[in-house]
Amino acid sequence: MVKLRPKQCGRKQRTYRIVAIESQSRQEGKVIKEVEFYNPRREETQLDILAITTLCGSGVKLTETVCNIFRRATFKIT
């Protein structure tokens, strides 16, 4: 099963990329598609709405963390 989940980037100042990844693979595993960038320090979110809708239409599940990020986001469409 494929899920949208956060992938950590950076060591000291954490940022996250929301990626479509196989649920059985490890956190830093092979990414199928990258759909979002999230910076919790600046509350900055950049989304690719078209990619998210096509992935969700094809059966990709959202993790609870990603759902919370979507709810809090001030959307910048890329």
From Swiss-Prot:
Cysteine disulfide links: none
Superkingdom in the source lineage: Eukaryota
Pfam families, alphabetized: Ribosomal_S16 (PF00886)
Record keywords: Chloroplast, Plastid, Ribonucleoprotein, Ribosomal protein
One example of a Gene Ontology biological process annotation: translation
Gene3D superfamilies: 3.30.1320.10
Main location: plastid
Record's subcellular location: Plastid, Chloroplast
Cell membrane recorded as keyword: no
GO molecular function: structural constituent of ribosome
One annotated Gene Ontology cellular component of this protein: ribonucleoprotein complex
Coiled-coil annotated residue ranges, if any: none
Family per record: Belongs to the bacterial ribosomal protein bS16 family.
NCBIfam families, alphabetized: S16
Protein name: Small ribosomal subunit protein bS16c
Gene name, Swiss-Prot/TrEMBL: rps16
